[in-house]
Amino acid sequence: MDLPGPIHEILMLFGGFILLLGGLGVVLLTNPIYSAFSLGLVLVCISLFYFLLNSYFVAVAQLLIYVGAINVLIIFAVMFVNGSEWSKDKNYWTIGDGFTSLVCITFVFSLMTTIPDTSWYGILWTTRSNQIVEQGLINNVQQIGIHLATDFYLPFELISIILLVSLIGAITMARQ
């Protein structure tokens, strides 16, 4: 969005704060329904970031696919699971949880040290969507495809990975 600088920064900070609160809610809430609603809040905040970054198509795709479909699927799967099954476990911390936390923390710190040292110049696309063909000669579907393959390649791939993980999680929950 073309917003003045201070308003844009305030919306980014507000979205980041709500995103962090929602992420903590996903991880820390013991009721899976509340956790699923927190996940929906996180996905809406991610969509807000895409809107603020002028990626309207990716933002709408984020809302439709993740909030509209995946989050509803997760909520239905959680609602079909027996409620007493979640309240039986009183052991909140196991060795597997500690190992998983250690692996996640190691992964996050390795990303935090690797990303600033990476030369992003070689990764950037040398062609942009406006250099491929004249915009007036192609229709809207082709423009969307060109933008997805050039300008929005990284967000599109990240969204597809998140979709894959969500589907695997939903299938795993449905099997149990």
Curated annotation (Swiss-Prot):
Keyword Ribonucleoprotein part of the UniProt annotation: no
Reading the lineage from the top rank, the first entry is: Eukaryota
Q: Which UniProt keywords apply?
A: Chloroplast, Membrane, NAD, NADP, Plastid, Plastoquinone, Quinone, Thylakoid, Translocase, Transmembrane, Transmembrane helix, Transport
Task: Name the InterPro entries on file.
Answer: NAD(P)H-Q_Oxidoreduct_6, NADH_UbQ/plastoQ_OxRdtase_su6, Nuo/plastoQ_OxRdtase_6_NuoJ
Q: Which family does it belong to?
A: Belongs to the complex I subunit 6 family.
A GO-annotated cellular component? chloroplast thylakoid membrane
Q: Which reaction does it catalyse?
A: a plastoquinone + NADH + (n+1) H(+)(in) = a plastoquinol + NAD(+) + n H(+)(out); a plastoquinone + NADPH + (n+1) H(+)(in) = a plastoquinol + NADP(+) + n H(+)(out)
Enzyme Commission code? 7.1.1.-
What's this protein's name? Answer: NAD(P)H-quinone oxidoreductase subunit 6, chloroplastic
Q: Which source organism? A: Hordeum vulgare
Give the multimer and partner information: NDH is composed of at least 16 different subunits, 5 of which are encoded in the nucleus.
